[in-house]
């Protein structure tokens, strides 16, 4: 309908404003979540192109496993715990056409906010858990994707920010053809209308609140208070020790004595603070 077309155009304008989106980028809103991107992306890259996947946590590992099945020309770059800074300084990822990174590993609590830390100029970035929480540069970016439900809406719609130069002609079925999806203005099939409607409301609110600078300051302030407490009580807790890559979106920690973890989570639940046991693979996740 004309009304929905207007809604889509308004969201594109909001996202362009929020992210200061360059003119050579387009906005795509589709279904399938971030996991679907592990299928969509490798199927829309020339099989002769070499892809690398930087793995510094659980979600990056899942991406690598899926990419490798669909594009055997995919290399693994795996980082050991608390060694991301040194790894990025030593690796220039030469001979790669594209490098995939996960900006925020929610289970490990590790975050790459500055893409210039990564020595590659064609980045594919999973920003599912921190898109909308800080400003960043698109200079090295070919493609960004994120499920809206973490910071910018409700489940059902995935936000994709696409460098138009990344799009190529492929002989895939329609919904696996990234170029067709993008040029269809996100309506190749029936779009997730309510999720998109909510996304529009949230992006308008984010702009009125002060944009990405405001949300970055808020996340830094709140996470720093918690990290300060953990640092002061490091004899009690295990958590990320690599200061510059500590996640500002979610702080992950556990008690060194396991018996206290369940007690802490139960007392939080009793106080109305639910879900801090986070993902099924993590312990305490705030």
Where in this protein do the model-derived segments appear?
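Conserved N-terminal alpha-helix of the aminotransferase class I/II PLP-enzyme fold
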Residues: 1-37, 44, 56-58, 66
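PLP-dependent aminotransferase-like
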Residues: 35-99
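Active-site C-terminal subdomain of aminotransferase-like
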Residues: 148-227
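Conserved PLP-binding catalytic core of the aspartate aminotransferase-like
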Residues: 237-267
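Conserved small/polar residues in nucleotide/adenosyl-binding loops
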Residues: 284-286
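Conserved active-site segment immediately N-terminal to the catalytic lysine
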Residues: 124, 137-149
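Active-site phosphate-binding strand-loop segment of PLP-dependent enzymes
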Residues: 67, 79-131
């Amino acid at each position: 309908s004309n009304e929905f077309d207007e809604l889509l155009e308004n969201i594109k304008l909001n996202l362009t404003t929020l992210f200061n989106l360059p003119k050579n980028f387009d906005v795509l809103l589709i279904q399938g979540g971030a996991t679907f991107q592990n299928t969509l992306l490798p199927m829309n890259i020339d099989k002769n192109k070499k892809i690398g996947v930087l793995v510094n946590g659980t979600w990056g590992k899942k991406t690598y496993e899926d990419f490798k099945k669909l594009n055997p020309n995919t290399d693994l770059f795996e980082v050991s715990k608390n060694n991301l800074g040194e790894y990025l300084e030593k690796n220039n990822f030469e001979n790669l056409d594209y490098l995939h990174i996960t900006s925020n590993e929610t289970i490990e609590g590790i975050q790459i906010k500055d893409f210039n830390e990564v020595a590659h100029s064609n980045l594919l970035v999973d920003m599912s858990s921190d898109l909308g929480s800080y400003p960043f540069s698109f200079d090295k970016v070919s493609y960004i994707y994120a499920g809206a439900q973490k910071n910018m809406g409700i489940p059902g719609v995935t936000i994709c920010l696409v460098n138009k130069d990344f799009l190529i002609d492929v002989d895939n079925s329609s919904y696996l053809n990234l170029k067709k999806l993008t040029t269809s203005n996100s309506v190749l099939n029936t779009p997730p209308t309510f999720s998109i409607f909510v996304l529009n409301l949230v992006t308008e609110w984010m702009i009125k609140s002060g944009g990405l600078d405001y949300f970055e300051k808020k996340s830094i302030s709140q996470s720093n208070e918690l990290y300060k407490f953990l640092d002061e009580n490091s004899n009690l807790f295990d958590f990320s020790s690599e200061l510059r890559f500590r996640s500002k979106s979610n702080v992950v920690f556990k008690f060194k004595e396991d018996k206290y973890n369940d007690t802490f989570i139960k007392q939080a639940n009793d106080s109305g603070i639910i879900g801090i046991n986070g993902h099924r693979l993590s312990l305490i996740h705030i």
